[in-house]
């Protein structure tokens, strides 16, 4: 299903979502992470704060809806952003790591995987990762399909 087709289907249930679609895929393991969201095991994500300013992109907003894509740019589900915060990487909580639903869901696993990704993405953009680097933490709930 294309993002537009899924958006149109959900709009019949929730007309207040409007016409503007924000569709995206996770930065790594696109299919696995999209499937975790679809199954309700992944209800949070994190991204490197420095990349938002560099790309002139605004931070995610609570109450908005996003279409989650797979590696083929097909719509997997729609989520509503329920919480957005910014904090240093080294202050991300075990609770947030668990909500991300990846690996063994531990903070140690989360830090290992995300430090590697953030360091690489920031380096590619000419920025440096440190344990104090800010990260954008998002929490969401799957709203479609139910």
Annotate each language-model stretch with its function.
Residues 1-78, 84-146:
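Mixed-charge, low-complexity intrinsically disordered regions
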């Amino acid at each position: 299903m294309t993002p537009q087709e899924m958006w149109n289907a959900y709009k019949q249930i929730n007309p207040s979502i409007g016409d503007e679609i924000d569709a995206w895929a996770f930065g790594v393991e696109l299919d696995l992470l999209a499937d975790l969201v679809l199954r309700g095991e992944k209800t949070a994500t994190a991204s490197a704060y420095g990349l938002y300013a560099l790309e002139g992109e605004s931070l995610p907003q609570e109450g908005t809806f996003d279409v989650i894509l797979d590696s083929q740019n097909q719509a997997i589900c729609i989520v509503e952003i329920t919480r957005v915060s910014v904090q240093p990487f080294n202050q991300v909580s075990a609770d947030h790591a668990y909500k991300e639903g990846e690996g063994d869901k531990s903070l140690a696993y989360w830090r290992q995987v995300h430090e590697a990704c953030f360091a690489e993405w920031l380096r590619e953009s000419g920025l440096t990762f440190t344990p104090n680097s800010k990260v954008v933490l998002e929490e969401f709930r799957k709203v479609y399909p139910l």
